[in-house]
Curated annotation (Swiss-Prot):
Record's keyword annotation contains Aminoacyl-tRNA synthetase: no
Subunit structure: Interacts with nop5. Component of box C/D small ribonucleoprotein (sRNP) particles that contain rpl7ae, FlpA and nop5, plus a guide RNA.
Protein name: Fibrillarin-like rRNA/tRNA 2'-O-methyltransferase
Gene Ontology terms for molecular function: histone H2AQ104 methyltransferase activity; RNA binding; rRNA methyltransferase activity
Amino acids binding S-adenosyl-L-methionine: 82-83, 100-101, 125-126, 145-148
The protein's role, per its UniProt record: Involved in pre-rRNA and tRNA processing. Utilizes the methyl donor S-adenosyl-L-methionine to catalyze the site-specific 2'-hydroxyl methylation of ribose moieties in rRNA and tRNA. Site specificity is provided by a guide RNA that base pairs with the substrate. Methylation occurs at a characteristic distance from the sequence involved in base pairing with the guide RNA.
NCBIfam families reported for this sequence: PRK04266.1-2, PRK04266.1-4
Gene name in the database record: flpA
Length: 226
């Protein structure tokens, strides 16, 4: 019998031959990206591959993930919905506003949302929050994973629009999308400084860690409004 260990609200470690990160499947019997389904005492879990998910990597890097089943999340850079689907599992009675710019990925997201009613796909540029402000309510957490050069600025723009006063920001900073020449550590330092000082609102950094060995040249950041 596999063993299940709760790591935080809605996030688990399933031990079956090896330890695997997992969430409870909100859509029983269905997979999203070829992940394994493991049933334990009548509950179906979906394994969560940290090499395909920045948020999954952050969990394994011991970030506090401030989500509950009722949380409302703005997800910037939703792509085809790999990580969005796990957030959907975690916030089973909440909502995930999934912003994605690529029409091909949006088709996948719409298909996912047809089976998971807490996912709300939004075809838009994450750098232009005014264009979707009528579609998003105040949120408890913003998760951002975008491959654009102005990543800190995008986070700040969305936070001032949508983040509750007591809310949190989880950000995956991709160094090579910002500067292909500078050392990643220099890029990370500059982006974190921007979050702390350059924009309104300003953020207090609670945690910042390199996401190796799961993702090269990426920094995970957990922050809250000052």
């Amino acid at each position: 019998m596999p063993e299940v260990k709760r790591l935080s609200d809605g996030i688990f470690e399933v031990i079956k031959d090896k330890k695997q990160l997992a969430t409870k499947n909100l859509d029983p019997g269905k997979t999203v990206y070829g992940e394994k389904l493991i049933a334990v005492e009548g509950v179906e879990y979906r394994t969560w591959d940290p090499r395909r998910s920045k948020l999954g990597a952050m969990v394994l890097k011991k970030f506090n993930i401030p989500l509950t089943k009722n949380s409302k999340v703005l997800y910037l850079g939703a792509a085809s919905g790999t990580t969005v689907s796990h957030v959907s599992d975690i916030v089973s009675e909440g909502a995930v506003y999934a912003v994605e710019f690529a029409p091909r990925s949006m088709r996948d997201l719409i298909g996912l949302a047809s089976r998971r009613k807490n996912i709300h796909p939004i075809l838009a540029d994450a750098g232009k929050p005014d264009s979707y402000s009528h579609l998003v309510e105040p949120v408890d957490l913003i998760f951002q994973d975008v491959a654009q050069p102005n990543q800190a600025e995008i986070a700040a723009r969305n936070a001032v629009r949508f983040l509750k006063r007591e809310g949190y920001l989880l950000l995956s900073i991709k160094a090579r999308s910002i500067d292909t020449v500078a050392k990643p550590k220099e890029v990370f330092k500059a982006e974190v400084k921007k979050l702390e000082q350059a924009f309104e609102p300003r953020f207090e950094i609670l945690n910042a860690k390199d996401l190796m060995p799961y993702h090269e040249d990426h920094l995970g950041v957990l922050a809250k409004l000052k």
